[in-house]
Amino acid sequence: MLDNQLLRENPQYVATQLLKRGFQFDAVTFSQLEEKRKALQVSTQSLQNERNLRSKAIGEAKSRGENIEPMREEVNKLGAKLEQQKTELDEILKQIEVISLSLPNIPHESVPVGKDELDNQEIRKWGDVPAFSFPVKSHDELGEALGQMDFALAAKITGSRFVVMKGHLARLHRALIQFMLDIHIQQHGYQEIYVPYIVNADSLLGTGQLPKFEADLFKLTGDNGYYLTSTSEIPVTNTVREMILSAEQLPIRYVCHSPCFRSEAGSYGKDTKGMIRQHQFEKVELVWITKPEDSYNALEQLTQHAEVILQRLNLPYRVVALCTGDIGAGSAKTYDLEVWLPSQNTYREISSCSNMEAFQARRMKARFRNPDTNEIQLVHTLNGSGLAVGRTLVAIMENYQDEHGNIHIPDALKPYLGGIDIISVK
């Protein structure tokens, strides 16, 4: 959510900035609603004051034994008019709230202006793209040939966009989770956190998934209004909702492993084969809560921490700055890490690292006390995948395959697999 004061005082500036995203904000209509709100608030307060004075006068007249019926009728008329204006004011406030909750974040000035992913800017590359002397296979071809990845069985159990993994591939998938957690906890200093995988609407509103992106979520039946979490960013970030932190507590740096559940609405026909885009997948998430002045340094650190995982696994990747037309609605600035997939002969996203600035904090009322001014200020929130586990498995399978369809284990993962150094076709 954007700053209400900014929206009220300079809606045209907001409209200009959001237009960089391709988002149309009707500043004129918003300004008209604001003028109505201000007029109604002044009028309502005036009527309230007048009714209070008249009510007091009735009490005084009654104590003197005077006829108070005419005065009471006037107060009743004032009361009816007051209730009518309160109803009108509530309706205006609801309209303003609906607009406010629909607005995306203002992009940071350093974000490249562009329309879509074609306008994203490559920042750096790491690692050499492997040169194979044989026709490469995709991860799903490799996994099925190994007899350890079964999409047809998953479809029978549930439906499309699910997978069953067995044997060493399932073990490798689990090893990746532990490896990522160990690096982030032991070397990067994150605190591990375990959170619910089911969240309520308030949490989703706080991090910005609701009301705009409900179609992307799996909602549970029943009266609780619960949803399966689409990313642990949601429950982890909401741990500071409605809190006033001390400056000494910041930055907070959490790492969390969780399954994620997404409906993939709008993804019809995209990545229909394999594990690239699934309804259920695992992720190791990094979340930072910082002071405003520290958040952009934090974004660089968070991104580098995610990069370390790819470097330890010796997977070629690149870092891309998303343009204004491609960044998520709540993000002020985002770096994507894209790993090389030989079967597609291209880089594919494996992590998004974002600075949300105060966008989520304003929704969550997540604040801290500034020791210099003693004022209560909004924190900044950041998040990034460190990494998406399934896509990391995909990248290992494809980059570490040999001509026989075997998968060689990266050196960094061998201690997690009890000495296994190759997953072989039988």
Curated annotation (Swiss-Prot):
GO terms for cellular component: cytoplasm. ATP binds at R262, S263, E264, E349, I350, S351, S352. Consists of two distinct domains, a catalytic core and a N-terminal extension that is involved in tRNA binding. Coiled coil: none annotated. Its EC number is 6.1.1.11. It comes from Legionella pneumophila (strain Paris). This is Serine--tRNA ligase. InterPro entries: aa-tRNA-synt_IIb, aa-tRNA-synth_II, aa-tRNA-synth_II/BPL/LPL, Ser-tRNA-ligase_type_1, Ser-tRNA-synth_1_N, SerRS_1_N_sf, SerRS_core, tRNA-bd_arm.
